Amino acid sequence: MALMSQAGSSHCIYSEKMKCISGHSSITSNMEMLKMKDICFGNISSRNSSKPMQGIYLDRVGVERRRGRLAIVAASPPTEDAVVAAEPLTKEDLVAYLASGCKSKEKWRIGTEHEKFGFEFGTLRPMKYEQIAELLNGIAERFDWEKVMEGDNIIGLKQGKQSISLEPGGQFELSGAPLETLHQTCAEVNSHLYQVKAVAEEMGIGFLGTGFQPKWGLKDIPVMPKGRYEIMRNYMPKVGSLGLDMMFRTCTVQVNLDFSSEADMIRKFRAGLALQPIATALFANSPFTEGKPNGYLSMRSHIWTDTDNNRAGMLPFVFDDSFGFEQYVDYALDVPMYFVYRKKKYIDCAGMSFRDFMNGKLSPIPGDYPTLNDWENHLTTIFPEVRLKRYLEMRGADGGPWRRLCALPAFWVGILYDEVSLQTVLDMTSDWTAEEREMLRNKVPTSGLKTPFRDGLLKHVAQDVVKLAKEGLERRGYKETGFLNEVTEVVRTGVTPAEKLLELYHGKWGRSVDPVFEELLY
């Protein structure tokens, strides 16, 4: 996932030359953070906890300072081999980790991630792992990316702050760098698609921009050689009926956005959750399953309702007066674990408790205690509609064609990065009940913008929200409003992308889904 914990994190105690456990010197890169004082959460410990906050400093290159001891924490988990714990983590440490994401407004960035389905032009069948490996190697060699390996298998690429990774069924994911403007975001997407196509087309491979695999069943999807996915694959059927579909047959586009303080995080979290069903409707793009209409406009969104309700959903507690970083930590601690990573291997801990882990009582590795990398890994196994890490992830949209990959971050940046639009949304949604939010979340995958809401349709609310997003982008002053054109047309007509595909299926396509591979080809 795109990591937006770049230089500028505001939870900083020291900034000095430090002698690390390895014996090497490391100089922290965030001198300016000393000036930020308690912009982020100087009052958290007094408001949310009886214990004083432990001093943690976690910078971009992964140096941790805690209780006067030093340890190296590698920047890209899982890399537990680099961690030497001074003493067991406390709950306060976990809270401080989330709070370390706070940034002053001038350091806010946009991190966009998208997934896509690779397929063979001749057969429309999903890419096999061997083809994916050839593609990754080709991109690495031609465009100077660094290879990411798991054992002998190539499983991804890195270049600067961008990374390419593989979802369980070979879905090809770009996790973009933290960027300042939507122009940069769209340029990054275009550059990535150019590079992928340059290699893939020579192999007879294309990529499809949709939210759910339209033609092939689970048995037809290849399994990627990644240890964490094997653990998830074994666990999913125990906790929901659609978890394997989520893993192997869905694609999304999401944006990761920053916050300045705990209070700012809360406001953005609430606005994001309230409006997430609107984003789901605007980007609904997964109406086909195994060659036929599936009864949904966003099958991808529906799948999350029966994947694992311990780790998905609309998080009603975010709207409680007591909500803050500490309450999210309490929630995350109660989400069952999937795995820990030790000695270059994933250890199955599915269903076990992170609280037990913190007490050294995790049965597969008794006496072992978690590191911040373990905590970061655990946070990536939680899948609500909006997810908190050291930034907020908006997770409600289906994958789609490249213009929509630019429109999704534009929608959320216009709302969440503009104070006037954000406050207007909070005022607009302040009297929405938890039951209404849940109703929208459950009905939108089927009825989209035609979902009844109060005395009208969701379309009418969406029109107001898209207008607020546009006004927010205008106030940013970067001439970014054009990126909203895709969703402006959707709210004008009330017709979602999925409904357009269904119209083609029943008409021009002669009840075949095969043409969708051309219609939504990148």
UniProtKB/Swiss-Prot annotation:
InterPro entries on file: GCL_bact_plant, GCS2, Gln_synth/guanido_kin_cat_dom, Glut_cys_lig_pln_type
NCBIfam families named in the record: glu_cys_lig_pln
Post-translational modification: The Cys-186-Cys-406 disulfide bridge is known to modulate the enzyme activity according to the redox status. The oxidized form constitutes the active enzyme.
GO cellular component: chloroplast
Domain of life: Eukaryota
Feature: transit peptide: 1-45
UniProt-annotated location(s): Plastid, Chloroplast
Keywords: ATP-binding, Chloroplast, Disulfide bond, Glutathione biosynthesis, Ligase, Nucleotide-binding, Plastid, Transit peptide
Subunit structure: Homodimer or monomer when oxidized or reduced, respectively.
Reactions this protein catalyses: L-cysteine + L-glutamate + ATP = gamma-L-glutamyl-L-cysteine + ADP + phosphate + H(+)
SUPFAM superfamilies to which the protein is assigned, alphabetical: Glutamine synthetase/guanido kinase (SSF55931)
Keyword hit for Isomerase: no
Pathway: Sulfur metabolism; glutathione biosynthesis; glutathione from L-cysteine and L-glutamate: step 1/2
EC number(s) stated in the UniProt entry for this protein: 6.3.2.2
Primary location class: plastid
Molecular function, one GO term: glutamate-cysteine ligase activity
Disulfide bridges in this chain: C186-C406
Family the UniProt entry places it in: Belongs to the carboxylate-amine ligase family. Glutamate--cysteine ligase type 2 subfamily.
Protein name (Swiss-Prot/TrEMBL): Glutamate--cysteine ligase, chloroplastic
One Pfam assignment: GCS2
Annotated GO biological process: glutathione biosynthetic process
